[in-house]
Amino acid sequence: MGRSYGGRVLAAMTLLGIPAAVLVALAAQLLFQLQAGRAELRRVRTDGLHPELDPDAGLPEAAAGALLPLATALAALAQVLGLSCLLLAALCGHLGAELARGPGPGRSDWFLYDCRLLRHSALGLFCCGVSVYLAALAIYALLLFEIEAGAAAASILGSGALILVAIMTHTLFRAVQATRRGLRELSPPSFEDEPARPSEDSKSGCRAQPPQDEETETPIGAVTHQGSHF
């Protein structure tokens, strides 16, 4: 039972670390694309708008110049959140695997049971990173495409980010409630210390038996002594 618990936790942390690494890579790619867009915007500012360009092809220059730093900051924040989630998942998985190699297999299960707050934090960081990345991607779509298509894409991505934040908040709140309820109603998984308890009980029982034997031997000795007087 202990090994199955630890195995499930390690598998969950692995499944969380893979999309966190993908999120870090996507945020880094978006950062480079936004940097290229900023260089293009600077070139347009220095060269001036060509008369043959359609002014309705995208956002105005002032709006684009204001949204580009915001999108860059959001992409960098998404990368930091994804990297933090990846490091927490890797740390919990590595320490759990190292403790499983010890003399007692229950040490790993106790550690993974006690670090559930870190696992909840890693999941929250990942969901926040995805939400921030969707917000940055919405701004980038608004800058890249035409006004109509960019506004539609930005609204869809922004609504998805808000829905994800709401789901994440509700899920983490329920997880915290379930954890507190489990700590009150359920006992933590028994792994290593319980097999030692019966041996201690048996030793204490063996130590308690000799005084009883002495008490039973005392009346017998008294009876034999009285018989000798008769």
Curated annotation (Swiss-Prot):
Biased composition (Basic and acidic residues): 194-204
Any GO CC annotation of this UniProt entry: membrane
Record's keyword terms, sorted: Membrane, Transmembrane, Transmembrane helix
Membrane topology value: Multi-pass membrane protein
InterPro entries noted in UniProt: Jiraiya (IPR029201), TM221 (IPR053101)
Record carries keyword Cell membrane: no
Membrane-spanning segments: 12-32, 73-93, 125-145, 147-167
Subcellular localization, as worded in the UniProt entry: Membrane
Pfam families: Jiraiya
Entry annotated with the keyword DNA-binding: no
Location of the region described as Disordered in the Swiss-Prot/TrEMBL record: 184-230
Protein name: Transmembrane protein 221
Taxonomic source organism: Mus musculus
Name of the encoding gene: Tmem221
